[in-house]
Structures are given as C-alpha cells and as structure tokens.
Curated annotation (Swiss-Prot):
LRR-type repeats, residues: 230-254, 255-280, 281-305, 306-333, 334-359, 360-385, 386-406, 410-435, 436-460, 461-488, 489-514, 515-538, 539-563, 564-589, 590-615, 616-641, 642-667
SUPFAM superfamilies attached to this UniProt entry: F-box domain, RNI-like
Pfam families: F-box-like, LRR_6
Annotated compartments: Cytoplasm, Cytoskeleton, Flagellum axoneme; Cytoplasm, Cytoskeleton, Microtubule organizing center, Centrosome
Organism, scientific name: Homo sapiens
Protein name, entry field: F-box and leucine-rich repeat protein 13
Gene Ontology BP annotations: SCF-dependent proteasomal ubiquitin-dependent protein catabolic process
Keyword presence, Repeat: yes
Length: 735
C-alpha cells in the first residue's frame, strides 16, 4: 500500500467518521429540542390546568363563603325569631297578668267605692233619723254598737309640741270650740305658743268686740302677729292692741273704722312692729308722721289704696330716725302721689328692696326715675295697671340689681326693654310680662342668656311664635325654667311643645291655654316632660285621644281642660284611672260631661283638693253625693251653672267635705237661699246667686241647650272670661 493510498484511506475514514459523528450529533440535538419542547408543553399544560383549577376553586371558594355567610345569617335570624317569640310570649303573659291585676285592682276600687258609698248612705240615714228625733228615744242595739265601737284617743297625752302642731291647723273659731269640750281640752288651748298669732279676720262676723278685747288683754305678752283684715271694730277695740307690747306684725287692711287716733294708740304701745298693713284704710298725714317717730324697726309697710295722705305725709317718713330700715313698700292705688312724693320716698327709704305699685294710672317714667335715684337696692318690682310706664323705666332701673319684675297690660313696653334686661339684669329669676302686646320674638331672644330664670309669664303676648320660643329655649335659660305661662299665645304650635320637651328638664308648671294650633302630636311631646306636675290645656283642641296619651305621664297633679268641647266622659275616666295623685281638675264649661266623671274621681282620685265643674249642666245630686263620700280633702269647689243640683248636695258637703274652704255656686237655680246661708257659715268664701245662666253658657235654667240665635253673643263673653282667667300663673296666684 502506498502512502498516497494510506493518506487517501485515512482521509476517507476521517471524513466518514466526521460525517457519522456529525449526523449523530445533529440527530441528538434534534432529539433534545423535542424533549425540551415536550417538557415545556407538559409544564404549560400543567400550568394551564393549575390556573384553571385555581380559578374554578376561587369561584367555588367564594360561593362556599357566601353560602356559609347566608347560613350564618339564617341561623342568626332564626335565633332572633326564637328570641322575639320568647319575648312575645313573656310580654303577652306579663300584659295578661298586668291586665288581670289592673282589672282586679279596679274591681277592688269599685267594690270599695260601693261599700263606702253604702256605708255613707247608712250614715246619712242614721244622721237624719237622729235629727228628726227631738226627744232622743232609746237607741237600737245596732246604733249603740256603732257608737260604742268608736275608738277613743286622748290627745292630751301627746307631747306639747305635737298638740301645738295639731291646733296650728285650726282656725281661731275651731280653737275656741275645742276649748269648750272639757277641762282637759281647755288646758290644751291655753298653751302660750298657740296665741303667738291670732287671726280675727276669719271670725269677724262671729266674735263681738268685747271678746276680742278680753283675748288681747289676756294674751298681750304672747301675741306677736295680729290680723284684723276686714273687721268692723270700735275704736276702743283697736286701742286694746296697744297692750300687746311684743307685737311684730299687724294687719288692719280693709278696716273702715281704723283711724289716725287708733294708729296713735298702737304706735305708742307697740314700738317693735316690723310689718304693718294699712291698706284700704282712712289714714291721713297724721299717721304718716307717727311711723318714723315710733316704728324705728319697721321693715314691711303697705299703704295700698290709702288715698287720704299726700306728698307731705311721705315727707314725714324722713323725720326723726326715719323709716330707713324699710324693705318692702306697697303703694298700689295711691294715685295722689306725684313725682315729688316719690322723691320724698327715695330720701327716706333708701333700703327698699321690694316695691309694689299696682292700679296706678298716674305712674310715669319720671316717678320711677325719681325713686331709683337713691333706692338702688330694689330687687323686686311689680307694676300692674300702670299704662304710662315705657322703655325709659327699664333704662332708669339699670342701676338696680333686679331679680323679680312684673308688668301687666302695658302697651308701651317693647322689645327694647328686653335688651336692657339682657345687659343689666343677669340675675333675674322671675319675669311677668302678661298682656304686653308690644313684645315679639325678639324679646325672647334677648331673654335666652338669663341663667337664673325660673319663672316666665308671657300670657296674652299674642305676637310670640314658634321661632322666638325656639331661640329662647336654645339658650341656657331653658335649663332652670320651672314655670312657663304661654296662655293665649295663639301662634304657637306642636314645634314649640317638642322643643320644650327637649330643653326643659325642670319644668313643673306649663300653661298652653287657648293655643289653638296644638294637636294630639303636641300632647305626646308633653308626656316627655317628666318633671311636669301642672298643665293647662283649656280652650285647646284636645280630644279623648289626647287625654289617653296624657294619662301615661303618671305624675300630673293639676289638669285644666276648661272649654274643651271634644272631650267626653270616656276621656276623663281614662285619665283618672292613671292619675291617682291628681289634686286639681278643671273641666268647667264642658257641657257634654255627666255624672260619670264624678264617679271616676270618687273611685280613683280621692286626694282631690280642687274641682271646677262650672258650666256642666248634666251633673246631678247623686254624683255630688259620691264626691262627698270619697273626696274628704276637697278645699275648693266650683259648681256654678250646675242647674240640676239641689239643697241636698250642701248637706252632703257639710258631712263629707269638712275641709271645704271655697264654694262657688252661681246660677244654681235649684239651690235655695236658706240652704246657701247655712252653708256660708261652714266655709271661708262663698259665691251664690239664683240667676239664670248667661246665654254664653249654652243652656237655659233647666239645662236645655239654647238655640243658635241665642248663642250669637257667646263667643265674646267666653273670650273675655278666658283672658281674665289665664293672666296669672299658679305661683303668682299663690303669692
């Protein structure tokens, strides 16, 4: 073999080997790409499947979560339904039990009422039988048992303090009667402390002068307070007062026989007098000269309606030691006093704190300016019946620290006066601005910052509306307000009452008389004033529904719904059932009411002290018999216009209502004059006549409704009566 062939063979072999290995390498690379691609495809398929599974699982998971939430809500709802069902069962049982107990209690009250009424009638029968037996025949065994079962109580065994407290509740006439029972009772009525204060005005028509003189002579060292108001006494009797050396208070108002000479004797013998009431007497300048000479410690002086003294008499007050300790002064009705007279008062009585000047049309701004120049301590001011007082008076009073102010029936007082009040009298607690037509909502806005205000009387201020009251209640004054009189403020509506329930937590007395826009919704807001004890809704549109809502209050003691023609017996009965503590009720001029309301009062409201059913012609003797049998604490009763009542009710009242003090029975055509005269000796004040009821009552002397033609003039008369009755608030009347 040649080298060339070897080289050629080697080259061929090498080429073949390279070709073989290259093809093999190429095939291997292709195989690797397919494997990688297959792996990638597998991974892609796996990833795709995972993402698909993840998406499906997410939807499934969301679905399952929703199902779980729905199931949870369903279970909660089922639990709530079961709980509400249990509550419903419990409340149903409680309601049935409460109704059963209420029904049982009501039945017990009715049964007790019937038993007491039966006992009352038996007592009346025995009493009348005893009155008819003039020879006092032997009693039956039952009557003897009734008498003998009475428990004996000897009050003379009580401590002296307790005995005094018992006798303090009695009038002078009752004390004298008690002293005539026996020797032990006479000794109890001779306690010295019992004769510190003697009120002869309550027995002015009973006790003659000689007994008054002997009483004063016997107790001359113990007497501290004497009241002769309205007594028609001889001058000698007044002179006996001078023996009471320790006398501190003397009231001789309305005594026509009291003269300057009587005053001279008293002033010489009683130098320690602190309070002196000379109102409506015939005193002159001579008495005025005696006051500073003898009464050096005089603090309270009333010269109301004494028109015989002059400015010169007021000048005498500065003589000697003067009346510089005078704190209270009443000059009501003294129209003879001029501006100079008020200057004399300012010079003599610089310490005056309480000033009352009523019924004085001659009072002007200059009079007040002259007075307050030196009397800067005035805190209480009363000007009623002074039409010439204007805003200038408030400007002049800016130097005084007023706490109580009262104006009434003044047309010259405007909103400007209240701007002075806001700036100068931050401590005002009582504001009476009744029947001041110039007052608007702006005035209430000025009063809102008064933090000490407790009493606000804006009766007959017809220009006041919801907006003004809202602005007032939004201020700090609403938090302490205790009494609010908005009678005849006809622009007020339910919005004002809603604001009252939100902002007045301490409101006790509220008058919304003749607020005609008040509805049942407003009555619902009144229930939310939890501190309320007295409400006047007379002349409003209240119905039985409103009374049912009002009965939920539970704490009302006084309710007035006079001239409310939509209420019936059912409404009053529903209210009485829930108002067991009711003390005052006025349903006068609600002619649709009958005996049923009196029965409800006798059953549920036995603590009643004041009742007015004037203008209710359907009330009969049987109703008053029930009232007398149950309501033994009745003090004030107005049955004027109850034309069906007879003399029988007066006998019942004398037996059952022994605490009756004021009785009004005008237009009672079936009550005789003789019976009324007998009754007058049992009460302190009585009004009686047998005239036919006025036409605006709406019925005749037999209780039959009058025709529309006869009732044309009724609205005017009723309005005048309503305006007159609604002027004063409860606290003002008490004062």
């Amino acid at each position: 073999m040649t080298p060339e062939l070897m080289i050629k063979a080697c080259s061929f072999y090498t080429g073949h080997l390279v070709k073989t290995h290259f093809c093999t390498w190429r095939d291997i690379a292709r195989t690797n790409e397919n494997v990688v691609l297959a792996e990638k495809m597998n991974r892609a398929v796996t990833c795709y499947n995972f993402r698909l599974q993840k998406s499906v699982f997410h939807h499934w998971h969301s679905y399952m979560e929703d199902q779980k939430e729905k199931l949870k809500n369903i279970l909660l709802r089922i639990q709530q339904i079961i709980y509400c069902h249990k509550l419903t069962i419990i409340l149903t049982k409680w309601r049935n039990t409460a109704r059963h107990k209420s029904k049982k209690k009501e039945d017990e009250l009715i049964l007790k009422h019937e038993l007491q009424l039966k006992k009352w009638k038996n007592r009346l029968i025995l009493k009348r039988a005893a009155a008819e037996e003039s020879n006092f025949p032997e009693r039956s065994s039952s009557e003897v048992f009734l008498v003998d079962e009475t428990l004996k109580c000897d009050i003379s065994l009580l401590p002296e303090r307790a005995i005094l407290q018992i006798f303090f509740y009695l009038s002078l006439k009752d004390v004298i009667i008690c002293g005539q029972v026996n020797h032990a009772w006479m000794l109890m009525t001779q306690l010295n402390s019992l004769w510190n204060a003697i009120d002869f005005s309550s027995v002015k028509n009973v006790i003659p002068d000689k007994y008054i003189v002997s009483t004063l002579q016997r107790w001359r060292l113990n007497v501290l307070r004497l009241n002769f108001r309205g007594c028609l006494l001889r001058p000698k009797t007044f002179r006996s007062v001078s023996h009471c050396r320790n006398l501190q208070e003397l009231n001789v108002s309305d005594c026509p026989t009291f003269t300057d000479e009587s005053m001279r004797h008293i002033s010489e013998g009683c130098p320690g007098v602190l309070c002196l009431n000379l109102s409506n007497t015939t005193i002159t300048n001579r008495t005025m000269r005696l006051l500073p000479r003898h009464f050096h410690n005089l603090q309270n002086l009333s010269l109301a309606y004494c028109r015989r003294f002059t400015d010169k008499g007021l000048q005498y007050l500065n003589l000697g030691n003067g009346c510089h300790k005078l704190i209270y002064l009443d000059l009501s009705g003294c129209t003879q006093i001029s501006v100079q007279g008020f200057r004399y008062i300012a010079n003599s009585c610089t310490g005056i704190m309480h000033l009352t000047i009523n019924d004085m049309p001659t009072l002007t701004d200059n009079c007040v300016k002259a007075l307050v120049e030196k009397c800067s301590r005035i805190t209480s001011l009363v000007f009623t019946g002074a039409p010439h007082i204007s805003d200038c008076t408030f400007r002049a009073l800016s130097a005084c620290k007023l706490r109580k102010i009262r104006f009434e029936g003044n047309k010259r007082v405007t909103d400007a006066s209240f701007k002075f009040i806001d700036k100068n009298y931050p401590n005002l607690s009582h504001i009476y601005m009744a029947d001041c037509k110039g007052i608007t909502d702006s005035s209430l806005r000025s009063l809102s910052p008064l933090k000490q205000l407790t009493v606000l009387n804006l009766a007959n201020c017809v220009r006041i509306g919801d907006m003004g009251l809202k602005q007032f209640l939004d201020g700090p004054a609403s938090m302490r307000i205790r009494e609010l009189n908005l009678s005849n403020c006809v622009r007020l509506s339910d919005a004002s009452v809603m604001k009252l329930s939100e902002r007045c937590p301490n409101l006790n007395y509220l008058s919304l008389r003749n607020c005609e826009h008040l509805t049942a919704q407003g009555i619902g807001y009144i229930v939310n004033i939890f501190s309320l004890v007295s409400i006047d809704l007379s002349g409003t549109d209240i119905s039985n529904e409103g009374l049912n809502v009002l009965s939920r209050h539970k704490k009302l003691k006084e309710l007035s719904v006079s001239e409310c023609y939509r209420i019936t017996d059912d409404g009053i009965q529903a209210f009485c059932k829930s108002s067991l503590i009711l003390e005052h009720l006025d349903v006068s001029y609600c002619s649709q009411l009958s005996d049923m309301i009196i029965k409800a009062l006798a059953i549920y409201c036995i603590n009643l002290t004041s009742l007015s059913i004037a203008g209710c012609p359907k009330i009969t003797d049987s109703a008053m018999e029930m009232l007398s049998a149950k309501c033994h604490y009745l003090h004030i009763l107005d049955i004027s216009g109850c034309v069906l009542l007879t003399d029988q009710i007066l006998e019942d009242l004398q037996i059952g209502c022994k605490q009756l003090r004021i009785l009004k029975m005008q237009y009672c055509t079936n009550i005789s004059k003789k019976a009324a005269q007998r009754m007058s000796s049992k009460v302190q004040q009585q009004e009686y006549n047998t005239n036919d009821p006025p036409r605006w009552f709406g019925y005749d002397r037999e209780g039959n409704p009058v025709t529309e033609l006869d009732n044309i003039t009724s609205s005017k008369g009723a309005l005048e009566l309503t305006v007159k009755k609604s002027t004063y608030s409860s606290e003002d009347q008490a004062a």
